[in-house]
Regions:
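A non-catalytic, helix-rich entry segment at domain boundaries
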Residues: 1-32, 36
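Short, surface-exposed helix-loop/turn micro-motifs enriched in polar/charged residues
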Residues: 4, 21-25, 41, 69-72, ...
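Non-catalytic protein-protein interaction segments used by genome-maintenance enzymes to assemble
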Residues: 28-88
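Generic recognition of stable, solvent-exposed alpha-helical segments in well-folded globular domains
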Residues: 3-10, 28, 42-45, 57, ...
């Protein structure tokens, strides 16, 4: 436990140094959102940080994982951009000019950024629709794994966790 506390402290110190050196124009933190795709898929969540930049708005998602990944392949970031691109009742709207994964443990290159095009966002929307349809039709082969520990749905609709009566 002490080891993790020390790691957390060091991560926060490094993050604070970076922010002080290059302060962002933060317009929202933990920004709640809720929207639907085709009025039958409902998505909600919170965007870690939204900044105002010279080029528009920028979405940042903080990550504590040890292995950095590419923003371009991150569906979570794309969902944030999808929401903002179609938001009408929010004070913050419009397709973000960039979206970034901020890897807090990464000292050299903490950011992985990507600007999602409209075509990419439409592709993500179609992927979500296809996955949702397959889930509704029970056309998937769920695989139990370590990731199941964080799944909110395992006891609601996952066949791998159904109890036999």
């Amino acid at each position: 436990e002490e080891k993790f506390r020390e790691q957390g402290k060091n991560i926060l110190i490094e993050y604070a140094k970076r922010i002080i050196e290059n302060p962002p124009t933060v317009i929202s933190r933990e920004h709640p959102f809720e929207f639907s795709i085709n009025n039958n898929i409902f998505i909600r969540g919170k965007i870690d940080r939204i900044d105002q930049t010279e080029n528009g708005i920028s979405v940042i998602d903080y990550k504590t994982s040890k292995t950095p990944s590419l923003a371009k392949k991150n569906i979570q970031l794309a969902v944030y951009c999808l929401y903002l691109s179609q938001a009408v009742e929010d004070k913050i709207t419009g397709t973000p000019s960039s979206s970034s994964l901020y890897f807090l443990r990464e000292l050299e290159e903490p950011l992985s950024s990507h600007s999602f095009s409209n075509d990419e966002l439409n592709n993500i929307k179609n992927i979500i629709l296809n996955i949702a349809e397959k889930i509704r039709q029970n056309l998937f082969d769920p695989k139990k794994g370590y990731h199941c520990n964080w799944c909110d749905y395992k006891h609601l609709l996952c066949p791998k966790f159904e109890t036999k009566v």
